[in-house]
Amino acid sequence: MAELTISSDEIRSAIANYTSSYSPEASREEVGVVTTAADGIANVSGMPSVMANELLEFPGGVIGVAQNLDTDSVGVVVLGNYETLKEGDEVKRTGEVLSIPVGENFLGRVINPLGEPIDGLGDITDTEERALELQAPSVLMRQPVNEPMQTGIKAIDAMTPIGRGQRQLIIGDRKTGKTSVCIDTILNQRDNWESGDPSKQVRCIYVAIGQKGSTIASIRQTLEEHGALEYTTIVAAPASDSAGFKWLAPFAGAALGQHWMYQGKHVLVIYDDLTKQAEAYRAISLLLRRPPGREAYPGDVFYLHSRLLERAAKLNDELGGGSLTALPIIETKANDVSAFIPTNVISITDGQVFLESDLFNQGVRPAINVGVSVSRVGGDAQTKGMKKVSGNLRLDLAAYRDLEAFSAFASDLDDASKAQLERGERLVELLKQTEHAPQSVEHQMISIWLAGEGEFDDVPVEDVRRFEAELIEHLRSNASGVFDQIAGGTPFTEESQAQLKQSTSEFKRGFQTTDGTPIIREPEARAMEQDEVKQSEITVTRKTV
């Protein structure tokens, strides 16, 4: 058996190597203890150094956001299943403020307000982190809004135009088509996306707050069927989610949009709707025992929306010239725009599109009340061609509404008033559009210009929309040069106007109304007078046998 020898030098060397590589460390962790947990709110004792909006970790991987920072306790909004929490549970600080992953791979996906995919299509890779609560761009970082954000809806693009970087409120009662207006705006960006031109492409973010899960699934299907999902991200906080998720969802959409905006890209964010976010924030504030104010909303509910919507901007060229356009939706009750939340958001935004239930029930869709709707950016957000053809449209419609109200009491109207009424009826009909069928700027310009020139005056009201659709198809085939000339909203030339007039006259000759009569009838033949007829006498000679 071999003899075991131990060298003291080897032992000394091994001990020296171990001690040189060892660095004594002491980990320090600040923890707290749950005192109460109910209704999505947890009160935690301890953690005197916790930060506002810091993420806290509960047992089972549940996270929360620190909100109330009292001297001896912290009020935490729990994000996730709070029913598993109980008194005495240990809570750990993370040292991080609430943030979400962002990146190009979020396009075409459905995520929750924490940036986690919920569409069953796997994890999202190659991402960066961005804080949810970010300071809005300063005044010096911005430039005036001067690029149009085409919605594809004539009534909006012509009279209440939206620009890239603008905040335009969509407001109205429930079931008046607010979501449809916003979805059509997303669908209208498809041609820009397919062009491949970064200066035209618009990335869209649809934030669904407090909606039914089936409604969100239906919207996703609509976007997919129309080829719009590839440039759209859906941030979903359905009605089944806790109030904390509904409160944070708009900030998640804004953080994702700002990531692209600071890269010099153009983004459209739709918040559907901020009324439900305000209600969720009210519930959180009351559970945190913050003092209530008007309509039981907390005192900082205005700041909740202002700091969110101020993140929409058109950056200056030094920062890349990117933009973030916001379309917040607010639901009113009985068309009452003087309620607390509607007046708050109206004062924050750069204009509003007001949808009325009365117009909707009359078949005017989109049900936009032109008199109340306004865009504070105005013509700066329009192309030169659209600005030129739509200059008198709002005035014509306003005059028609006044005359319509007057005609209800007046028995006799002069010919000029009757003509104005008839043209107004056709303008209202012309501004109606089918859902999910946005129109190009060239289509809109041609329709509005021809209506202003009186080309629709002899078309029966019930045939106006069919006449317009068939006329546009006819013009695409027989006057395609006009579409090329006004592409992108360039003003009409005199040659284009003459060609439009001629092609429209040709089309009218072959167009038949619903009852089968042509618009342009051939003049009836006039009976000839007796002295205008010359007859030769015919003499028949009959031989007798």
Curated annotation (Swiss-Prot):
It is an enzyme of class 7 (translocase). Keywords: ATP synthesis, ATP-binding, Cell membrane, CF(1), Hydrogen ion transport, Ion transport, Membrane, Nucleotide-binding, Translocase, Transport. GO terms for cellular component: plasma membrane; proton-transporting ATP synthase complex. Its main location: membrane. The record marks 373 as: Required for activity. It catalyses: ATP + H2O + 4 H(+)(in) = ADP + phosphate + 5 H(+)(out). Transmembrane segments: none annotated. The keyword Transport applies. Its EC number is 7.1.2.2. It is a peripheral membrane protein. Pfam families: ATP-synt_ab, ATP-synt_ab_C, ATP-synt_ab_N. One of its GO terms (molecular function) is ATP binding. ATP binds at residues 172-179. The keyword Acetylation does not apply. It is found in: Cell membrane. Produces ATP from ADP in the presence of a proton gradient across the membrane. The alpha chain is a regulatory subunit. Belongs to the ATPase alpha/beta chains family. F-type ATPases have 2 components, CF(1) - the catalytic core - and CF(0) - the membrane proton channel. CF(1) has five subunits: alpha(3), beta(3), gamma(1), delta(1), epsilon(1). CF(0) has three main subunits: a(1), b(2) and c(9-12). The alpha and beta chains form an alternating ring which encloses part of the gamma chain. CF(1) is attached to CF(0) by a central stalk formed by the gamma and epsilon chains, while a peripheral stalk is formed by the delta and b chains. This is ATP synthase subunit alpha.
